[in-house]
């Protein structure tokens, strides 16, 4: 059973959209980035939700495209001394937590995440302190400070198993920050959960009514849904899962058409694996001009070629991720707890967003 806190509607200030580059400008920045990666002993690591040209460049230069935890683990294993993380701030922090000896750069430190912004460490700590009998479980889409307050850090691929484990021990749970994912897990497990009221601005916009109408147009299509979406949307899904799990589902499901309810940045990698299938964007509640995110994270869009080139060329405090060592060590404890639990289950832990 879940206990849901009063929701506080938050309108996040979206960053301005990057100015489009000409083809000549793109070519010049790509050439410069390739040279700088070699000169700086650096590797480009990109999230599935970044623009297709960024994902393509990461793969072309021997880097990596994946979800948040996969990105951090790849950076930990790669011999490069500098990691350039094309994603949002908590992803750079996660890389620094796992690999403190390396230099972690980001195209911009202003690339935020609404889940992170909606879960300030001071307020979350205050809430946890008010419920000392609860085990604190936080989603990976959080700051290092929030992770440090947690007993467990989880990703969407292993959250069910960990919550089931805690529920079997009769432990009440505080879950943060995504209310939709928390509600999904509570309904699946029956666990006693207090849910922090955060949401992803992209997934929160998907509309069940609009999705039903689209399904009527494409009756033979499979519906793929990220569990950060509202419950009414999740109920319509043929497959529910993290970014990596949805890509896998697109490959394994027999349908030749896929309606995909997650950030449309995922289409680049998904289409690589299923070039013969038709991928269709799931509709958002705004339907066109009135949507806010329009199925693409506005902060992910900040990871452009110009910003990547500048980060590699100039570095500095505007681009480098630092995590206080005491905080890093503390946040590593719940993260390692998840990894150890997964190893015992012989699971390959995938990321979330």
From Swiss-Prot:
Belongs to the quinolinate synthase family. Type 1 subfamily. The keyword Iron-sulfur applies. PANTHER family: QUINOLINATE SYNTHASE, CHLOROPLASTIC, QUINOLINATE SYNTHETASE A. Its EC number is 2.5.1.72. This is Quinolinate synthase. Gene3D superfamilies: NadA-like. [4Fe-4S] cluster binds at residues 113, 200, 297. Its cofactor is [4Fe-4S] cluster. Catalyzes the condensation of iminoaspartate with dihydroxyacetone phosphate to form quinolinate. Keywords: 4Fe-4S, Cytoplasm, Iron, Iron-sulfur, Metal-binding, Pyridine nucleotide biosynthesis, Transferase. Iminosuccinate binds at residues 47, 68, 139-141, 156, 226-228, 243. Pathway: Cofactor biosynthesis; NAD(+) biosynthesis; quinolinate from iminoaspartate: step 1/1. GO terms for biological process: 'de novo' NAD biosynthetic process from L-aspartate. GO terms for cellular component: cytosol. It is found in: Cytoplasm. Its main location: cytoplasm. Binds 1 [4Fe-4S] cluster per subunit. One of its GO terms (molecular function) is quinolinate synthetase A activity. InterPro entries: NadA, NadA_sf, Quinolinate_synth_A_type1. Pfam families: NadA (PF02445). It catalyses: iminosuccinate + dihydroxyacetone phosphate = quinolinate + phosphate + 2 H2O + H(+).
């Amino acid at each position: 059973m879940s206990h849901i806190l009063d929701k506080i509607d938050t309108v996040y200030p979206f960053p301005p959209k990057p100015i489009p580059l000409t083809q000549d400008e793109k070519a010049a920045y790509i050439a410069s980035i390739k040279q700088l990666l070699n000169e700086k002993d650096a590797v480009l690591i990109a999230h599935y939700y970044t623009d297709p040209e960024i994902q393509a460049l990461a793969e072309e230069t021997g880097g990596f495209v994946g979800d948040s935890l996969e990105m951090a683990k790849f950076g930990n294993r790669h011999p490069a001394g500098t990691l350039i993380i094309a994603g949002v701030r908590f992803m750079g922090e996660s890389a620094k937590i796992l690999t403190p000896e390396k230099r972690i750069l980001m195209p911009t430190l202003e690339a935020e995440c609404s889940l992170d912004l909606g879960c300030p460490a001071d307020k979350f700590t205050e809430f946890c302190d008010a419920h000392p009998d609860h085990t604190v479980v936080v989603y990976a889409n959080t700051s290092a400070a929030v992770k440090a307050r947690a007993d467990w850090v989880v990703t969407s691929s292993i959250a069910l198993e960990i919550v089931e484990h805690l529920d079997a021990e009769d432990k009440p749970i505080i879950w943060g920050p995504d209310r939709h994912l928390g509600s999904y897990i509570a309904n699946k497990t029956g666990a006693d959960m207090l849910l922090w009221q955060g949401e992803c601005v992209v997934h929160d916009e998907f509309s069940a009514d609009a999705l039903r109408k689209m399904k009527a147009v494409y009756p033979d299509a499979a519906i793929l849904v990220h569990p950060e979406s509202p419950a009414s949307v999740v109920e319509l899904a043929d497959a529910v899962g993290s970014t990596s799990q949805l890509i896998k589902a697109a490959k394994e499901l027999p349908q030749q058409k896929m309606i995909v309810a997650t950030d449309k940045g995922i289409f680049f990698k998904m289409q690589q694996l299923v070039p013969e299938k038709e991928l269709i964007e799931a509709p958002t509640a705004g339907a066109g001009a009135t949507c806010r995110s329009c199925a693409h994270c506005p902060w992910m869009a900040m990871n452009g070629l110009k910003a990547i080139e500048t980060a590699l060329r100039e570095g500095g405090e505007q681009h480098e991720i630092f995590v206080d060592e005491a905080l890093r060590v503390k946040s590593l404890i719940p993260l390692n707890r998840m990894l150890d639990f997964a190893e015992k289950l012989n699971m390959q832990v995938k990321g979330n967003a």
